[in-house]
Amino acid sequence: MKISLNGISVQHPSAKPGAVPALREQNLTVRAGEQLAIIGPSGAGKTTLLHLLACALKPSAGSMLLNDQDPWQLSRGALQKLRGALFLAPQVPPLPPRQRVVTAVLAGRLPNESLWASLRSLFYPTDIALAERALAGFDVGDKLFDRVDRLSGGERQRVGLARALVSQASLILVDEPLSALDPTRSQHAIETLTRAAQERGATLVATLHHVEMALAHFPRIVGLRDGQVAFDLPAAEVTPELLQALYAQHLHELTGLANLEADDLPTDPAPVVMHCR
């Protein structure tokens, strides 16, 4: 799916009048089938950007086109059909606690199924082999018939990612998919996700705190800070200097990044601000 953002600003519905928009005057073009990672410090607007692309938030200014269509100019039925081609995997997947994992995974197909098929699948999953393959891709194939409330946080996160594999989405949006995973499982999860997107020709947009993982597995990196695009570059062109500027006052979020040497970090510690009440 193609993406085109032109002068986009987004204000959260709950924001106070006059508040600074969560996203400001963003321009971004993504080709169909492209894979990119969005990085930046906490509060940069990464999750807001994904919700915008998922048509969950309406822009307050500018325009957004998905496959040359403005979602907010479509009829309700056409918008629902467009949303069926999108898949958003939030950082904490909304999995019903008493549901079996197989049912939770196959819910990734619901936007493209009839009402009757959707209701039937809640009680009689119809493609168990598909769910098992998707779970196996994230090393949780043995959890197929477990209840969701018996899974660890990392297992739940991988079940949420397995949903993306069974969906028919042409735009896959993934928010911090590695936050509950150890380094080995993080590596495997990203490889599974990027390979699956490439095989089906889907566009993949992922927000990542793991900068080193983003640079290693995504050909294009978008740096976001204070609701604006700081840089949009091939991964090979993202330098330690750019990362320093992007994460200024948030350098602790770059801890462990191999290509950011100790000499690159500032020698003077940032001032500590204490709030008393």
Curated annotation (Swiss-Prot):
Protein name: Phosphonates import ATP-binding protein PhnC 2
Binding site for ATP: 40-47
Reactions catalysed, as given in the entry: phosphonate(out) + ATP + H2O = phosphonate(in) + ADP + phosphate + H(+)
E.C. code: 7.3.2.2
Subcellular location: Cell inner membrane
Regions annotated as coiled coil: none
Summary of the function given for this chain in its UniProt record: Part of the ABC transporter complex PhnCDE involved in phosphonates import. Responsible for energy coupling to the transport system.
InterPro entries registered for this protein in UniProt: AAA+_ATPase, ABC_transporter-like_ATP-bd, ABC_transporter-like_CS, P-loop_NTPase
Similarity annotation: Belongs to the ABC transporter superfamily. Phosphonates importer (TC 3.A.1.9.1) family.
Predominant location category: membrane
Gene name for this UniProt entry: phnC2
GO cellular component, one term: plasma membrane
Binding partners and assembly: The complex is composed of two ATP-binding proteins (PhnC), two transmembrane proteins (PhnE) and a solute-binding protein (PhnD).
One example GO MF annotation: ATP binding
ABC transporter domain segment(s): 3-251
Origin organism lineage: Bacteria, Pseudomonadati, Pseudomonadota, Betaproteobacteria, Burkholderiales
